[in-house]
Amino acid sequence: MNKLALYCRSGFEKELAAEITEKATALGVFGFARVVENSGYVIFECYQIGEADLLARKITFSQLIFARQLIVVSDLISNLSVQDRISPIIEYYRQQEKILNLKQSSDIWVETADTNEAKTLAAFCRKFTVPLRQALRKQGWLQAKNKKSGITLHIFFTQSNSCYIGYSYNNNHAEHIMGIPRLKFPAEAPSRSTLKLEEAILYFIPPNQEATRFNENKYAVDLGACPGGWTYQLVRRGVFVYAVDHGKMATSLHETGRIEHCAEDGFKFRPPKHCKIDWLVCDMVEQPRRIADLISQWLVKGWCKETIFNLKLPMKKRYFEVQQCLRQIEDKLNKQNISFQLQAKHLYHDREEITVYIRLM
């Protein structure tokens, strides 16, 4: 196995290819990315055997922006028999037992790309999972006692008779099948954008810290808040929110008593002096470098402690623009000797944008 399969949003294959190539090169691993436009995935082929596994261990998955999953895979297995797809898969894994401890495997995920064309294939994958899991367990696999240090087996179907066979490391992969969290839209939320912030909180904030980082003693500012999709996520966690927008906020949010509507320009708004702001969130539709400059100002001036914001990416050179924006923020914080934690991700509920999280340390 000398390849990586990486999933992404359809249309972002080139950005992911550039990112994985850059990360691999930084580790002294060379190869090339196979890109099919709008396919929803990238195959990165290493020149040397064993280097794909090295990348799957050494590249910190949470530091990849455009990848939804990181899997070591085989060559594409084609022409699988409709009558028996399982036997060739079992046989392939048997051939890998000398280099892959399959007794450390904890689960099997049967997946496909997240595209409109693959929706019918996704239904097949769900049905195929049960008999395949049973067959793998008969081999003594999928029984790892320590799940965190184990591996997950992956079958990535590109067609009903063609698949990549592989594995990922449980301590360095996305925790959801296909890298997609299944979130339900809350009926009382003012807009569907609420799912973007919910996913961001679930992704960036450890579950055991959420209650201490979001509660009734915390204050937040939501720039460009109207009609209140992001404000809703903060209020439901007890946070008091200064909702900044010339537009109207949802009546249901006013009724909570946990917001103050500030009908102002998000770029000109200044935090109230009578309380310290814990969180700044921002989903304004604006040039990404202008947003990066605004967020930098809030952090450098100490107006907030943590922030989650989106950078819109309508331009062609999206990965380059992301790099420039993040570097712009990092340079300003480093210049002031401010310690910080930064993560960026193209979340499932993001479209032509990425979500960035920064915490001052």
Curated annotation (Swiss-Prot):
EC nos: 2.1.1.186
Highest taxon of source: Bacteria
Molecular function terms from GO: S-adenosylmethionine-dependent methyltransferase activity
Active site, UniProt feature: 312 (proton acceptor)
Catalyzed chemical reaction(s): cytidine(2498) in 23S rRNA + S-adenosyl-L-methionine = 2'-O-methylcytidine(2498) in 23S rRNA + S-adenosyl-L-homocysteine + H(+)
Major location category of this protein: cytoplasm
Family per record: Belongs to the class I-like SAM-binding methyltransferase superfamily. RNA methyltransferase RlmE family. RlmM subfamily.
Subunit comment: Monomer.
Protein name per its UniProtKB record: Ribosomal RNA large subunit methyltransferase M
Organism per entry: Histophilus somni (strain 129Pt)
